[in-house]
Regions:
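Catalytic glycan-binding domains that act on GlcNAc-containing polysaccharides
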Residues: 1-199
Length: 199
C-alpha cells in the first residue's frame, strides 16, 4: 500500500482532457506530459516550447493547421485542453510516420529529437534489431534519457490504470515495443479502423 501511495503522488492522474476527448491511451499521453512539463500547464522552455506537452509554436502550427499559433495565438498553448489535444495529435502523426510504425522507442525519439534527426540516426545506426542497443547508440544524451523516462512513465501508468504492459514484455525479450490502444474507447475505435481498412 505504501508503494501505491508513492506512485499515486509521483504519477497522478491529471484532471485535464483534450478537446474532443482522448484519441490515444491516457497512459501514453500522461507519460509524455509527465516528462515534458511535470503537469505544469504554464511550463515554458528556454527554446519556447509551451504547455503540458511542451509544444513548439512551429510544431503546433503545423499539427493544428493554424499559422497564428506561431505568433499571436501562441499563448493558447498554455490552455491544458488545447495543448493536450494538439500533443496527442502530434503523437499520432509521429506514430504514423514512415519507419516509426507505432514503435514506442522511435515515437519518443522523434518527439524529443525531431523526426528529421530520427531519420538521420536510423540511417547511421547499423544494428536496428536490438531496441536497447538502438537507444544506447543514439548520439543525443538528452534523447536517450527522454526515451528511457517516457517508457518508464508509460509502464507505470499502464499499471496505475490496471492495464497489462505488452510493450514492457516485448523490450524485455529484445523485441521492439509497439503501441497498442488498451483504453476501452481507443481499443474499440482501432478495431473499427482495422475493419474498414480490411474491406
Amino acid at each position: 500500500r505504501e508503494g501505491h501511495a508513492f506512485d499515486t503522488a509521483l504519477y497522478p492522474l491529471p484532471p485535464w482532457e483534450p478537446l474532443k476527448g482522448f484519441t490515444l491511451d491516457r497512459a501514453l499521453v500522461y507519460a509524455f506530459m509527465r516528462q515534458e512539463s511535470a503537469f505544469k500547464p504554464n511550463a515554458k522552455s528556454v527554446d519556447g516550447a509551451r504547455g503540458l506537452m511542451q509544444l513548439m509554436p512551429r510544431t503546433a502550427s503545423f499539427i493544428g493547421r493554424d499559422r497564428g499559433l506561431r505568433g499571436h495565438k501562441r499563448n493558447q498553448l498554455f490552455s491544458p485542453e488545447f495543448n493536450v489535444a494538439l500533443g496527442q495529435k502530434y503523437l499520432r502523426h509521429l506514430m504514423e510516420t514512415d519507419g516509426v510504425d507505432r514503435n514506442l522507442v522511435k515515437i519518443a525519439a522523434a518527439y524529443n529529437g525531431g523526426p528529421g534527426n530520427l531519420r538521420k540516426w536510423m540511417r547511421k545506426i547499423k544494428d536496428k534489431n536490438d531496441p536497447l542497443l538502438f537507444i544506447e547508440s543514439l548520439p543525443s544524451l538528452e534523447t536517450r534519457t527522454f526515451i528511457r523516462r517516457v517508457l518508464g512513465n508509460f509502464w507505470i501508468y499502464r499499471d496505475r490504470l490496471g492495464q497489462p504492459t505488452p510493450s514492457l514484455d516485448a523490450i524485455a525479450a529484445g523485441q521492439w515495443p509497439a503501441y497498442t490502444g488498451l483504453d476501452a474507447n481507443i481499443k474499440k475505435a482501432e478495431i473499427l479502423i482495422k475493419n474498414v481498412e480490411n474491406r
